[in-house]
A protein has these predicted regions:
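Basic, flexible Lys/Arg- and Gly-enriched helix-loop patches that mediate nucleic-acid binding at interfaces
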Residues: 1-247
């Protein structure tokens, strides 16, 4: 059997440190008994967090999967939606073991690259801010931003949840009288961050698509709404040096 915090981290419920805090707080039970640090669990055990049952992945199989998905507009990155909108999980195949965990999210009006894995610890590490994993987007904004606005975005703008900056801004299409298109890179994934940054310099985002997450690029031949399995090894070392302390 595997230690409880490792099993629950593998299910994508949080880092091992977070789950250890939950155990100390008495929030987790195993087969009706309040869990203690050092407890172990396996598939078939009745594990609950705050009274809610948790599906345990088969850690013994050692089989991890990674999938790339080209998200269309109007799909939500949640397992269910109270408004009845289609979710990205409806388009994914059945995972061989465990369940698919999204590595970050895209809002309903953003398209492009989404990564999914059955390795909860990997997902947590790649999403944690300390990992500083690059996200690349193609963004179209209304109007032609002046050089001053681009400088502000590179140096940093203040949002309601703190400062934010682009590591890189490269023009893709700049035509007088038309919306401008840029390729931008940043190293965090706060809610609607790219849109809010452009709004802070007075330009509305009219189209937004993610084209890269870490070393994984959106394949040019992957149609929107389609998925593809890729080797998980391409992400195993990403974010390890800076994010290890967060796990």
């Amino acid at each position: 059997m595997t230690r409880l915090q490792k099993v629950l981290a593998g299910a994508g419920l949080g880092s091992r440190r977070t789950i250890e805090d939950w155990i100390r707080a008495g929030r987790i039970t195993v087969n009706g008994r309040t869990a203690q640090l050092g407890d172990r669990a396996e598939p078939g055990d009745d594990v609950r967090i705050d009274g809610k049952p948790v599906a345990l992945p088969d850690m013994a199989s050692g089989e991890r999967q990674l999938l790339i998905y080209n998200k269309p507009l109007d799909e939500v990155t949640t397992r269910s939606d109270p408004q009845g909108r289609r979710t990205v999980f409806e388009s994914l195949p059945q995972a061989r073991t465990g369940r698919w965990i999204s590595i970050g999210r895209l809002d309903v009006n953003t398209s492009g690259l989404l990564l999914f894995t059955t390795d909860g610890e990997l997902a947590h590490r790649l999403m944690h801010p300390s990992g500083e994993v690059e996200r690349e987007y193609k963004v179209m904004v209304r109007g032609q931003p002046p050089a001053e606005a681009l400088t502000r975005l590179r140096n940093g703008v203040m949002l309601e949840d703190g400062p934010a900056r682009f590591d890189s801004i490269e023009p893709v299409a700049l035509q007088p009288g038309a919306d401008a298109t840029f390729k931008v890179i940043l190293r965090e994934g706060r809610n609607r961050e790219v849109r809010r940054m452009w709004s802070a310099v007075g330009h509305e985002v009219t189209r937004l698509s993610r084209t890269r997450y870490g070393p994984v690029e959106l394949p040019a031949d992957l149609p929107m709404g389609q998925w593809r399995l890729i080797p998980i090894a391409v992400l195993d070392s990403v974010g390890l040096k800076t994010a290890a302390r967060a796990i």
